[in-house]
Structures are given as structure tokens and as C-alpha cells.
């Protein structure tokens, strides 16, 4: 029985790490949706800080999900969080031409790897 309890505990802890949040922001002439997939951020910090942006003048909605939904035009994989030892995958939705400035930011500032879903 202790083995079964250990397996259940292991599965539960793996589910804790499989977390993401979809952040949708809207303002005049602005409609942005990203999904942040947690890689190494402590759970409480991820929920209280990373998924709760303070964007004055914008309508912000946050939805917690197990994994980021499909349909992103680009993903900044293993993005480094400024001044912290944490990593996350950032999925971008919406206007694919935004990749022109998101990709350089991802690779140069966030030290991540730019991925295009569906391409290998």
C-alpha cells in the first residue's frame, strides 16, 4: 500500500508542474492573448505574480489551464525570466506578423528558442 500512495503522490506533484495560464488583454485598438506554460517557477509565485499582470487601462482576463491551447503562431520555449532563475514557455496567439519583433525578443532578451508549432 505505501507504494500505491507514493505513486499517487508522484502523479499529483507532476500535475502541479503541468500548469499554464492564458492571459487575454484588451484596450482601445489592442487585443492580445498569450499563454504562459510554467517550466520552473514555484507554483504560488506563478499564480500570484506571473499570471496576474498589472496593466492599467486594459481589460485583463486570466484563465488557468493544464496546458497551453493549440493555435499559437509562435512559442518562446524555455524563456528566461529577468533577474530570476526561472523559465517558462510563452505561446503567442493572434497576429502572426508580430513574430517579426517577438522572435528577436525571445532569442536575445529571454534567451529562449523560437518555435513555430507544427514545423519541425
Q: Which sequence ranges carry the predicted segments?
A:
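Extracellular/cell-surface secretome signature
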Residues: 19-120
